[in-house]
């Protein structure tokens, strides 16, 4: 089982899970995550300011960020669809005055819930996050904006826009169809459905399990693990 919190020897870690409606943050030792609003006007500079205001009495020494978009070599390479601009090229290390590790948000959730084998993670939130871990190698994916049907993307059907347009029942059927399609193509041993809208599924598609949203924080802690056995399990 993955441990819930870093060991005492680990640094005090701040984990940020950036979503389309909220940024959720947790510092080593805190039992409850803090939420700050996000949305189309949120810039990285504003986020850093709000995070530090929320943590005036909670010191931290390193930062993990789950970013809602593609990340290459620890840097965002595309502006997020559901937030403000300025994320690509932003110097997070300088802004926080601390070491920072950035991964895709779905990848961070997948990392937090992974045990072994081949896992596919789909994050059903404002958008659609996706990641795979194959024998400890983390592979973020960008399935959201691939064509699905009727001139629309996967995200148009099973992201928040799809839920609002189709209604819960039809949306749930589309989730099942997408999962079946991806299972056939990628042959994962496990399929985990996470994100804020996963809880709206009345019946899970066959062969899937509902993820725990706390896995994002576990994944963020794992990025800085000082346990060599833990840190050597993953490549990202």
Regions found by a protein language model. Name each.
Residues 67, 124-126, 195-196:
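Short secondary-structure boundary segments
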Residues 23-27, 69, 111, 128-133:
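Short beta-strand scaffold segments in enzyme catalytic cores
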Residues 39-52, 56-64, 69-118, 157-158, ...:
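Glycine-rich phosphate-binding loop and adjoining helix at the ATP-binding site
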Residues 13-17, 62-64, 119-123, 192:
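Short glycine-aspartate micro-motif
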Residues 22, 182-213:
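Glycine-rich phosphate-binding loops at beta-strand->alpha-helix junctions
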Residues 23, 90, 94-109, 118, ...:
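Glycine-rich phosphate-binding loop plus the immediately following alpha-helix
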Residues 143-180, 187, 209-219, 224-232, ...:
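Helical "lid/coupling" subdomains associated with nucleotide-phosphate turnover
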Residues 2-49, 53, 57, 137-165:
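Short glycine-rich, Thr/Ser-proximal phosphate-binding strand/loop in the N-terminal lobe
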């Amino acid at each position: 089982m993955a441990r819930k919190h870093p060991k005492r020897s680990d640094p005090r870690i701040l984990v940020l899970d950036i979503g389309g409606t909220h940024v959720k943050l947790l510092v080593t030792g805190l039992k409850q995550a803090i939420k700050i609003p996000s949305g189309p006007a949120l810039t990285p500079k504003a986020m850093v300011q709000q995070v530090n205001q929320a943590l005036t009495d909670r010191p931290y020494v390193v930062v993990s960020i789950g970013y809602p978009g593609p990340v290459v070599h620890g840097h965002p390479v595309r502006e997020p669809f559901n937030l403000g601009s300025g994320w690509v090229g932003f110097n997070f290390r300088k802004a926080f005055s601390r070491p920072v590790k950035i991964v895709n948000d779905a990848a961070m959730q997948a990392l937090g819930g992974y045990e072994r084998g081949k896992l596919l993670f789909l994050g059903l939130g404002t958008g659609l996050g996706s990641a795979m871990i194959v024998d400890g190698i983390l592979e973020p994916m960008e399935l959201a904006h691939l064509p699905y049907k009727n001139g629309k993307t996967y995200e148009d059907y099973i992201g928040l826009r799809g839920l609002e347009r189709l209604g819960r029942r039809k949306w749930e059927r589309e989730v099942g169809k997408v999962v079946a399609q991806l299972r056939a193509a990628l042959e994962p041993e496990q399929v985990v459905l996470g994100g804020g809208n996963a809880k709206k599924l009345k019946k899970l598609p066959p062969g899937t399990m509902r993820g725990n949203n706390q896995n994002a924080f576990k994944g963020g802690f794992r990025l800085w693990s000082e346990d060599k056995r833990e840190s050597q399990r993953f490549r990202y």
